UniProtKB/Swiss-Prot annotation:
Residues with attached carbohydrate: 37, 46, 134
Keywords: Cell membrane, Disulfide bond, G-protein coupled receptor, Glycoprotein, Membrane, Receptor, Signal, Transducer, Transmembrane, Transmembrane helix
GO biological process: feeding behavior; G protein-coupled receptor signaling pathway; neuropeptide signaling pathway; phospholipase C-activating G protein-coupled receptor signaling pathway; response to glucocorticoid
Gene: GPR83
Stated name of the protein: G-protein coupled receptor 83
Cystine connections: 144-224
């Protein structure tokens, strides 16, 4: 809720700082960009006259920006994302790696999602903030490429990892008796995800160029802009269109279908055997909570990234012109998605909260001797989620379904539900 309120405050204030179309602004822009002796205002060391013409056509990209109030608001908004994203995602990785009971393929996917969020938080979000506040790129040519790569690669890794998690949960619920994905296969899937994300991100990273120009008599500025090969307009348009369809729309459709089927299965499944009224309503509450969590995953992923993806697609298609206020508001909103994933996938998980509390209690006080510790009333992960490291089900007699249930083809939701809430 807080990030959404910050976005509502951020957009009108930043929009108010956009340069007006008045005569004075037009004269200053033309004076800086269209004088006969253009070499006085532009670095010609590595560029051609066509580069200069393209740059002039995009001159509004680096408009003078922001009064002190808006700059302060931007710093607070982006700092909020950076702090919460780093804290939440690093904590997720630490808790999972620290606890042997949480080592599984699904946990690997969650860690992979956290790593992608950490990458974009460190390699893109701070640089975008500084660029907007200072109205110039100060990090050099190398980071111009790295920052763009981090943004696209993190987005693609997140989308593909969310898809892998959705498919994994779908298999668990729809086919509860089949073996889970092993850790070895999980590592292979993650390697494939990063390979695909790198392949689709490299064109965006390579086709970046650092333009340097003299903004005024005393100010020299640099801009990190896309610079695609000819025909540049078509290359840019179809690259963004392919990225939007293959790595946003398609994963979102797969996630939606998988979770819709899971939700239907959980909602229609009845607990097998005699149950009391209290047990029935408790099961119903668990069903609703699980369905809400699954739908929240889809909605947040779609909402956070749709504005920025749609804006970039329209911009590359020349349907709209560059607008700093919209771009940075949409960019901030997309970056805020890195704060939600730890809560959705881990902190809403009861078993993860138990592990987190145990970890925090160990940091606050020394552990008691082993013989003084009472047996834990909390069931182990392996009781509800019985799998070996090779993905095979452990032969626990207590977890085997009766023969009548196996022959009926029904799913005992009391054994399936804990798997959903932990994965």
């Amino acid at each position: 809720m807080v990030p959404h309120l910050l976005l509502l405050c951020l957009l009108p204030l930043v929009r108010a700082t956009e340069p007006h179309e008045g005569r004075a602004d037009e004269q200053s822009a033309e004076a800086a960009l269209a004088v006969p002796n253009a070499s006085h205002f532009f670095s010609w060391n590595n560029y051609t006259f066509s580069d200069w013409q393209n740059f002039v056509g995009r001159r509004r990209y680096g408009a003078e920006s922001q009064n002190p109030t808006v700059k302060a608001l931007l710093i607070v908004a982006y700092s909020f994302i950076i702090v919460f994203s780093l804290f939440g995602n690093v904590l997720v990785c630490h808790v999972i790696f620290k606890n042997q009971r949480m080592h599984s393929a699904t946990s690997l996917f969650i860690v992979n999602l956290a790593v992608a969020d950490i990458m974009i938080t460190l390699l893109n979000t701070p640089f975008t903030l500084v660029r907007f506040v200072n109205s110039t790129w100060i990090f050099g040519k190398g980071m111009c490429h790295v920052s763009r790569f981090a943004q696209y690669c993190s987005l693609h890794v997140s989308a593909l990892t969310l898809t892998a998690i959705a498919v994994d949960r779908h298999q668990v619920i729809m086919h509860p008796l089949k073996p889970r994905i092993s850790i070895t296969k999980g590592v292979i899937y993650i390697a494939v995800i990063w390979t695909m994300a790198t392949f689709f991100s490299l064109p965006h990273a390579i086709c970046q160029k650092l333009f340097t120009f003299k903004y005024s008599e005393d100010i020299v500025r640099s801009l990190c802009l896309p610079d695609f090969p000819e025909p540049a307009d078509l290359f840019w348009k179809y690259l963004d269109l392919a990225t939007f369809i293959l790595l946003y729309i398609l994963p979102l459709l797969i996630i939606s279908v998988a979770y819709a089927r899971v939700a239907k299965k959980l909602w229609l499944c009845n607990m097998i055997g005699d149950v009391t009224t209290e047990q029935y309503f408790a099961l119903r509450r668990k069903k609703k909570k699980t369905i809400k969590m699954l739908m929240l995953v889809v909605v947040l992923f779609a909402l956070c990234w749709f504005p920025l993806n749609c804006y970039v697609l329209l911009l590359s298609s020349k349907v709209i012109r560059t607008n700093n206020a919209l771009y940075f508001a949409f960019h901030w909103f997309a970056m805020s998605s890195t704060c939600y994933n730890p809560f959705i996938y881990c902190w809403l998980n009861e078993n993860f909260r138990i592990e987190l509390k145990a970890l925090l209690s160990m940091c606050q006080r020394p552990p008691k001797p082993q013989e003084d510790r009472p047996p834990s009333p909390v069931p182990s992960f392996r009781v509800a989620w019985t799998e070996k490291n090779d993905g095979q089900r452990a032969p626990l007699a207590n977890n085997l379904l009766p023969t009548s249930q196996l022959q009926s083809g029904k799913t005992d939701l009391s054994s399936v539900e804990p798997i959903v809430t932990m994965s």
